[in-house]
């Protein structure tokens, strides 16, 4: 099992290219099921999760051409040989569940296992299923599988989500592209990745308006066509590297960064005393901190355009070194402070009270062996390790590989002393 060895204390200096967005790529790949024509995706991130999904698509009959190391992925779902997504594959990653709607929209039926993925609270798929039912799908849940049928096709519906859900918004939008009539989504999520998906689907011939606002309208069409589409840059990866540079100190420029999508994070870094130069026209973000003490900043995670839950763990790692006390409130997912006890092993002073964490800044973190528990938690330990004194070992980094492309290479190119090793946990 791989692990990362990090010798902290080295400031970072250089440029880091931002990869394609995992959270966008996973939904874009599923869109191939809606057409019998080939699709080419560029700027596709090479991640464990995107590779898992490619394997599932192959099981369904999609032709996948995606050479190792390439950022261009070709998908052709001309002939689907199966509409069953088995537990063995769906359990590896929650986003696999999103094949359900497109399969029903195109084939009239599907059987898909309930999802797996990061162990972050309950994260139910009720909203997904309620939306499909509203569009006329007949659903049964049996032995861990959702069996769905819409023999005469899906029908447009007026759907008002009881809570804001990125996954349910995207899933319903995918299915509605081929439904008869108009589907209106109210209380829709507004994340940039939803806009990215809508842009791609519209390029394929869909009729979607309002993506990025709380009300999305989808006029169903008879068929979608193939296209070539570039995956948007990953705002979570960009934010992660920004916080790594702020924690370790130094001068790092992020190239190809989605500046407009990171307003909340940029504001919090500036509030914490970090110098941030963001250039939307050039798609660059420059992070500088040379000896300036960090200030404690409190925040609550919120749906976009608020502070993203997927950057909460990274920001907590940064706040462990700030002067003062910060309160971090998690409002999106339950049980998303699993990184707190591992950060405490490095000397952080964190008290978790339900959905709230109180972080009292310390003068110095000290290296220790730690264990990754989920994707974002794992990278928070890397950030802390870059700032800690001594050698930190991060075990179980398979979580990290699910969402970060060549992390150690990108950090290493900026002067981080970080190395991947194989073998037993330390």
Curated annotation (Swiss-Prot):
UniProt keyword annotations, A-Z: Cell cycle, Cell division, Cell shape, Cell wall biogenesis/degradation, Cytoplasm, Peptidoglycan synthesis, Pyruvate, Transferase
Q: Which reaction does it catalyse?
A: phosphoenolpyruvate + UDP-N-acetyl-alpha-D-glucosamine = UDP-N-acetyl-3-O-(1-carboxyvinyl)-alpha-D-glucosamine + phosphate
Please provide the Gene Ontology terms (biological process) for this protein: cell division; cell wall organization; peptidoglycan biosynthetic process; regulation of cell shape; UDP-N-acetylgalactosamine biosynthetic process
- InterPro entries given in the database record: Enolpyruvate_Tfrase_dom, Enolpyruvate_Tfrase_sf, MurA_subfamily, RNA3'P_cycl/enolpyr_Trfase_a/b, UDP_GlcNAc_COvinyl_MurA
Catalytic-site annotation from UniProt: 118
Q: Where in the cell is it found?
A: Cytoplasm
Superkingdom per UniProt? Bacteria
Q: Which GO terms describe its cellular component?
A: cytoplasm
Residue numbers binding phosphoenolpyruvate: 22-23
Q: Which Enzyme Commission number(s) are on file for it?
A: 2.5.1.7
The primary location reported for this protein is: cytoplasm
Write out the residues that bind UDP-N-acetyl-alpha-D-glucosamine: 94, 123-127, 310, 332
Q: What are the recorded GO MF terms, alphabetically?
A: UDP-N-acetylglucosamine 1-carboxyvinyltransferase activity
Which pathway features in its UniProt record?
Answer: Cell wall biogenesis; peptidoglycan biosynthesis
2-(S-cysteinyl)pyruvic acid O-phosphothioketal modification sites are 118
Q: Which family does it belong to?
A: Belongs to the EPSP synthase family. MurA subfamily.
Task performed by this protein: Cell wall formation. Adds enolpyruvyl to UDP-N-acetylglucosamine.
Which PANTHER family does the annotation name? UDP-N-ACETYLGLUCOSAMINE 1-CARBOXYVINYLTRANSFERASE
Q: Give the protein's recorded name.
A: UDP-N-acetylglucosamine 1-carboxyvinyltransferase
The species this protein belongs to is Hyphomonas neptunium (strain ATCC 15444)
């Amino acid at each position: 099992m791989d692990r990362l060895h990090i010798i902290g204390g080295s400031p970072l200096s250089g440029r880091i290219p931002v990869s394609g967005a995992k959270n966008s790529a996973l939904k874009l790949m599923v869109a191939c099921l809606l057409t019998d024509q080939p699709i080419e995706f560029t700027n596709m991130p090479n991640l464990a999760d995107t590779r898992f999904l490619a394997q599932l698509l192959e099981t369904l009959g999609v032709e996948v051409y995606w050479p190792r190391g390439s950022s261009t992925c070709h998908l052709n779902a001309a002939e689907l040989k199966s509409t069953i997504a088995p537990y063995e594959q769906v359990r590896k990653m929650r986003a696999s569940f999103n094949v359900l709607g497109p399969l029903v929209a195109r084939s009239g039926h599907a059987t898909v296992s309930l999802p797996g993925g990061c162990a972050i609270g309950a994260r139910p798929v009720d909203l997904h299923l309620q939306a499909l039912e509203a569009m006329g799908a007949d659903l049964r849940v049996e032995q861990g599988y959702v069996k769905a049928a819409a023999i005469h096709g899906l029908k447009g519906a007026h759907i008002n989500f009881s809570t804001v859900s990125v996954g349910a918004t995207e899933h319903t939008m995918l299915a509605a592209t081929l439904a008869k009539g108009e589907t209106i989504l109210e209380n829709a999520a507004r994340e940039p990745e939803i806009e990215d998906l809508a842009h791609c689907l519209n390029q394929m011939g869909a009729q979607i308006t309002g993506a990025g606002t709380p009300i999305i309208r989808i006029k169903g069409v008879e068929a979608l066509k193939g296209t070539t589409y570039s995956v948007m840059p990953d705002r979570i990866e960009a934010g992660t590297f920004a916080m790594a540079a702020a924690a370790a100190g130094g001068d790092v420029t992020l190239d190809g960064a989605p500046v407009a999508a990171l307003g909340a994070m940029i504001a919090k870094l500036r509030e914490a005393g970090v110098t941030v130069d963001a250039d939307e026209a050039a798609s660059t973000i420059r992070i500088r901190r040379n000896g300036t003490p960090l200030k404690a900043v409190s925040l609550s995670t919120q749906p976009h355009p608020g502070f993203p839950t997927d950057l909460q763990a990274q920001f907590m790692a940064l706040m462990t070194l700030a002067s003062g006390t910060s309160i971090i409130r998690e409002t999106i997912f339950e049980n998303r402070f699993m990184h707190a006890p591992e950060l405490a092993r490095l000397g952080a002073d964190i008290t978790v009270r339900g959905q709230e964490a109180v972080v009292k800044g310390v003068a110095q973190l000290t290296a220790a062996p730690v264990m990754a528990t989920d994707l974002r938690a794992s990278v928070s330990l890397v950030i802390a390790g870059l700032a800690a004194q001594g050698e930190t070992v991060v075990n179980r980094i398979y979580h990290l590989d699910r969402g970060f492309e060549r992390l150690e290479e990108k950090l290493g190119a900026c002067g981080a002393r970080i190395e991947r090793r194989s073998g037993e946990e330390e």
